[in-house]
Amino acid sequence: MHTTRCILALLLCLTQAMSGCYCQGTLIEEIENLKKYFNSSSLDVVNGGDLVFNILTNWQKAGDTKIIESQIVSFYFKLFEALKDNQAIQRSIDTIKADLFANFFNSSMEKLNDFVKLTKIPVNDLQVQRKAVNELISVMPHLSRKLSLRKRKRSRCCFGGGNRPNKNILASNI
């Protein structure tokens, strides 16, 4: 019985690994299809350097990567939206969007819809500007949560029980 479970677990692992390879291979094929369609291997495309990749490599700290990744995903979603009527490349675009959906949005349709909704808000509309400024006081604490947590941790270690040599002496006496 134990051997049967081990074999089933092994088969499950192999199936998962092979499906991941298949999906990755399909994604690469679809990207290659887009490159061929747009003739993006041509020398004139390389002139002026990379459009997105250099920016991505400049943002390598753990907290920074999510910020720039969301902007890059937004860029590609806008690009795909502009190309949505092109039937010749629609399958490739759909495959790439599905991969972004699975990896960036954790397959959550609600997160994807919220993301797309944010990218489509018309920032030149006066009513939108007024609403956004009105909400800013509520939004900012959520956006700067990491910064305030770092400050709180730093304060805790230096005052009232942090790593002082003699904890019996008050911080004000040091």
Curated annotation (Swiss-Prot):
Distribution of this protein across tissues and organs: Released primarily from activated T lymphocytes.
InterPro entries per the UniProt record, alphabetical: 4_helix_cytokine-like_core, Interferon_gamma
Any single Gene Ontology cellular-component annotation: extracellular space
Glycan attachment positions: 39, 106
Localization per Swiss-Prot or TrEMBL: Secreted
Family: Belongs to the type II (or gamma) interferon family.
Protein name: Interferon gamma
